[in-house]
Each structure stands twice: as structure tokens, then as C-alpha cells.
Amino acid sequence: MCNEPATSDVALPDLDWAKGDGLLPVIVQDADTLRVLMLGYMNSQALEVTQRSRLVTFYSRSKQRLWTKGERSGHVLHLVAIDADCDADTLLVQARPRGPTCHLGRTSCFPAAPGQFLGALDALVAERERERPQDSYTTALFEQGVRRIAQKVGEEGVETALAGVVQVDDALLDESADLLYHLIVLLRARGLSLADAVTVLEARHR
């Protein structure tokens, strides 16, 4: 099945509020692409409001009050899961953003790291699988079924190997891109995600 982040909460007494004078740093991550969106701070009340409303809410150190992300712009963060780190003094929030997170109109307050596009592509393919927009090549693949998608992966794999053998770098890069795309579509067609495959790689690395 898809490696969908499970909705989870953390217990207030289990967190080390004393270390940060009642505040914990909060890293917000896109639940679908896994891209880091922003950094904020929560006190215990902000955490309680976040868990109750399912809208990510912070404590503003400058205004000395709670503020819900997007309370003016409408670009809210819908809570998916909250986890604490091993020292219980930092929170990781997984959320689904409605609109850009950064006040400058950007997706994230941080620049995109190399390789993050694959996560965004995986999320886009998942969206295509759910919504099935017309005139979309991805939609056409899903409607043809797993067997046809698997056939395309095989074809692209052979073409990638041949491009490597003839040592034409541009062709190898083009075919590799096609292979990665069709592999992501195949994973989604089977109810899996790119993150599931990465988890297997990580387990092997250990």
C-alpha cells in the first residue's frame, strides 16, 4: 500500500518544554513531496490548538501570541502528522499546504534541494491518478492499466540500457528520465509510492 503518513499526535508531558523556555522549534514538511516548507515555534497551547483544529498553529515570538499559518492569506497548512525528535525538544510536522507557504509567494521558505523534484513528480502523478484530468498522458496510462504501464517500464528500461551501451550521454539522460517517470506511474498504479521504494533502499543501506 501507499506509504501515506499516518495522522499522529504527541503527548504534551512527553516533550522537553523547559529547554527552550516553553517553546519548541517546529519543522514543517510537505506530507506528499517531503519538501521542508518552513520553520516555526510552538508552545504547549499552540500544539493543543494544532491538534484540535488540524490547522498548523504557531506561537509568534515577536507578537507574543498564537497565530495560525494562513490566517490572513488563506494559505493554511492542514495537519497530517506530528512527531518529536529523539530528544523530545523539536517537532516535525507533516502537513498539506493550501497555496504557497512562504510570504514571498514561494512553495517553501527554503530553496529546493537537488533531487526534491522527484518527490514533487511523485505527488503530481498521485494527483493525476486521483483526479484523472482529460488530455493527460498520465491519465491515459492509468486508464490502460498496470499491464500496459509495466510494459512501458520494460520498454524504457531497454532503451535506457541501449543508450548506455552506445555511450550517447544525451540519449542516456533522456531515456533515464522517461524510465523514472514511468516507474513512478507503475508504483502509483499498484498503490505504492516512490517513498516506499526509497524505504527499501534505506533498509538495504543499513
UniProtKB/Swiss-Prot annotation:
Cellular component, GO annotation: cytoplasm
UniProt keyword annotation of Hydrolase present: yes
GO molecular-function term, one example from the UniProt record: ATP binding
Chain spans, region Phosphoribosyl-AMP cyclohydrolase: 1-117
GO biological-process terms attached to the record: L-histidine biosynthetic process
Gene3D superfamilies: MazG-like (1.10.287.1080), Phosphoribosyl-AMP cyclohydrolase (3.10.20.810)
Pathway(s) where this gene product acts: Amino-acid biosynthesis; L-histidine biosynthesis; L-histidine from 5-phospho-alpha-D-ribose 1-diphosphate: step 2/9; Amino-acid biosynthesis; L-histidine biosynthesis; L-histidine from 5-phospho-alpha-D-ribose 1-diphosphate: step 3/9
UniProt-listed InterPro entries: His_synth_HisIE (IPR023019), HisE (IPR008179), PRib-ATP_PPHydrolase-like (IPR021130), PRib_AMP_CycHydrolase_dom (IPR002496), PRib_AMP_CycHydrolase_sf (IPR038019)
Reactions performed catalytically: 1-(5-phospho-beta-D-ribosyl)-ATP + H2O = 1-(5-phospho-beta-D-ribosyl)-5'-AMP + diphosphate + H(+); 1-(5-phospho-beta-D-ribosyl)-5'-AMP + H2O = 1-(5-phospho-beta-D-ribosyl)-5-[(5-phospho-beta-D-ribosylamino)methylideneamino]imidazole-4-carboxamide
Region listing for Phosphoribosyl-ATP pyrophosphohydrolase, in residue ranges: 118-206
EC number, as in UniProt: 3.5.4.19, 3.6.1.31
This protein's UniProt keywords: Amino-acid biosynthesis, ATP-binding, Cytoplasm, Histidine biosynthesis, Hydrolase, Multifunctional enzyme, Nucleotide-binding
Cellular localization per UniProt: Cytoplasm
Family under the similarity heading: In the N-terminal section; belongs to the PRA-CH family. In the C-terminal section; belongs to the PRA-PH family.
NCBIfam families registered for this protein in UniProt: histidine_hisI, PRK02759.1
Protein name (record): Histidine biosynthesis bifunctional protein HisIE
Gene coding for it: hisI
